[in-house]
Amino acid sequence: MEVDVPGVDGRDGLRERRGLSEGGRQNLDVRPQSGANGLPKHSYWLDLWLFIFFDVVVFLFVYFLP
């Protein structure tokens, strides 16, 4: 699509140029979504460490059963 060719109302070229530049700026300002407390919604490292912790706790509990 050629940007220099005016559209029906003559403003499409300017609108397209402005839209492209705004789109570039919006892509740079994207931030990861976070929950209400500021932590990421999906903290996979936290899930991993909690799994390891509970795995060790269950292992020790079963190991030391009389």
Curated annotation (Swiss-Prot):
Subcellular location: Endoplasmic reticulum membrane
Chain intervals with Basic and acidic residues compositional bias: 9-20
Alphabetized Pfam families for the sequence: ALN (PF17696)
Principal localisation: endoplasmic reticulum
Membrane topology: Single-pass membrane protein
Keywords, alphabetical: Acetylation, Endoplasmic reticulum, Membrane, Transmembrane, Transmembrane helix
Subunit annotation: Homooligomer. Can also form heterooligomers with other sarcoplasmic/endoplasmic reticulum calcium ATPase (SERCA) regulators ERLN, PLN, SLN and STRIT1/DWORF. Monomer. Interacts as a monomer with ATP2A2/SERCA2; the interaction results in inhibition of ATP2A2 Ca(2+) affinity.
Protein name: Sarcoplasmic/endoplasmic reticulum calcium ATPase regulator ARLN
